[in-house]
Swiss-Prot record:
HAMAP family for the chain: FtsB
Protein name: Cell division protein FtsB
Protein localization: Cell inner membrane
GO biological process: FtsZ-dependent cytokinesis
Transmembrane segments: 4-21
Mode of membrane association: Single-pass type II membrane protein
Organism phylogeny: Bacteria, Pseudomonadati, Pseudomonadota, Gammaproteobacteria, Enterobacterales
Physiological role: Essential cell division protein. May link together the upstream cell division proteins, which are predominantly cytoplasmic, with the downstream cell division proteins, which are predominantly periplasmic.
Length: 103
């Protein structure tokens, strides 16, 4: 009876070792858990971006104001009898500002 008990105990130890430290054990569980967390963070960023794009699409479909704003900003379009002024910062002030930032 002692040999059978020893054999069963050895089998139990081997099964427990393979369960905890073998394939699909604790190490794999931790790695997969980290992968899931990283994927959830990526999914959250992509969902926020999708929501923003859907809102922009709805805005473009719904009104002329968004289309006009986009045409003015991206294509520099103006209305008839409208004058476009571009304000360029003074180069000397720009150089002074960068010199102060470098200190």
């Amino acid at each position: 009876m002692g040999k059978l008990t020893l054999l069963l105990l050895a089998l139990l130890v081997w099964l427990q070792y393979s369960l905890w430290f073998g394939k699909n054990g604790l190490h794999d569980y931790g790695r997969v858990n980290d992968d899931v967390t990283a994927q959830q963070a990526t999914n959250a960023k992509l969902k926020a971006r999708n929501d923003q794009l859907f809102a922009e699409i709805d805005d473009l479909n719904g009104g002329q104001e968004a289309i006009e704003e986009r045409a003015r900003n991206e294509l520099s379009m103006t209305k008839p009898d409208e004058t476009f002024y571009r304000l360029v910062p003074d180069a000397s002030k720009r150089n002074q500002g960068s010199a102060q930032n470098n200190r």
